[in-house]
Amino acid sequence: MRQWPLRHVDMRTRVGSVSLPNPVLTASGTAGHGAELGSYVDLASLGAVVVKSLAAEPWAGNPAPRVHETPAGMINSVGLQGPGVSRWVEDELPALVNRGARVVASIWGRRVEDYARAAALLVGVPGVVAVEVNVSCPNLDDRSRMFAHSATATFDAVAATAVCGLPRWVKLSPNVADLVDIAGAGLNAGAEALVLINTLLAMAIDPRRGTYRLGSGSGGGGLSGPAIRPVAVRAVHDCRAAFATVGIVGVGGVTRGIDAVEMLMAGADAVEVGTATFREPRAPVQVLAGLQRWCRWNGVERVRSIVGVVHKAAAESQSIAVTQSTDATTGDDHG
């Protein structure tokens, strides 16, 4: 660590073609439609605000209870409740735009055509800089198997959203054995960035009553928070190793600036802060401040310079090892 911190750090980043003033965003589904945090956070100071996933039509979501706290996070089964894209554009988006927020609209569907309809409703909408395609949804045309659990279904869902004319980021599930292949399908369908990761499948049972703790019953819910951060870091790392130039947003258990540093070093261009806002609504700006402070004290003049450094270090180490091996062999030949 430096004796004296840098006075200035360039915090700008890019996710695909989208330029952002800094790499800290809110995560979809953890702050309502974004404006709810406005009493605690200057939304314009964040990289972007990612809103709760929206379907083409209003959706009621799952029955209560919807949330259960765990030792290192929470399980939710909200069920993607929302007013629908059109109502959101009319009632919720103006408040975000007026606050100077850069908005990422998240959409979902139960069939491929649902994704197309939701995307079409975002054409020409002001203030939206990108569309996050949430494919962690049951596909009614595939026995309710998650779109995100199939490379083919992921491709079809993402391809259907091209009508929006905006940069698209595909948000993927970690509950698969072939994440890199599925990520590749999303990219081949037109997504220019990966959002890694969505929640892990989870369940909670009340031992006293012998009943499910969540209203979704045997459907369980999704685990988020610090418990899943190592899984998210691994997903970011592996996808960055496979796709050197695409945009990557790391999400899952980011609660401190140092967590953001880890995600960026694994290969993320930006991070999303979600579950942490339930405990501390100012968490996104605190993470941003912590990240900036770390950069200042560690002599990092541009935050983008630490993106993927672990891959660069590994490549350099391998290169040195090969060189040393070659030198040793050459020495033996001339011994």
Label each region the model flagged:
Residues 1-103, 108-110:
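N-terminal capping/small domains of soluble enzymes
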Residues 24-28, 47-51, 103-107, 131-133, ...:
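Hydrophobic faces of well-ordered beta-strands that scaffold small-molecule active sites
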Residues 31, 106-109, 172-178, 229, ...:
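Glycine-rich beta-to-alpha transition loops that act as phosphate-gripper elements at the mouths
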Residues 35-40, 115-125, 176-189, 241-243, ...:
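Catalytic cores of alpha/beta
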Residues 61-71, 205-220, 277-300:
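C-terminal helical cap(s) of enzyme catalytic domains, especially alpha/beta-barrels
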Residues 74-75, 137-152, 182-246, 282:
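Glycine/Thr-rich beta-alpha phosphate-binding loop at enzyme active sites
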Residues 83-100, 148-170, 214-248, 287-301:
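Alpha-helix-loop-beta-strand connector modules within alpha/beta enzyme cores
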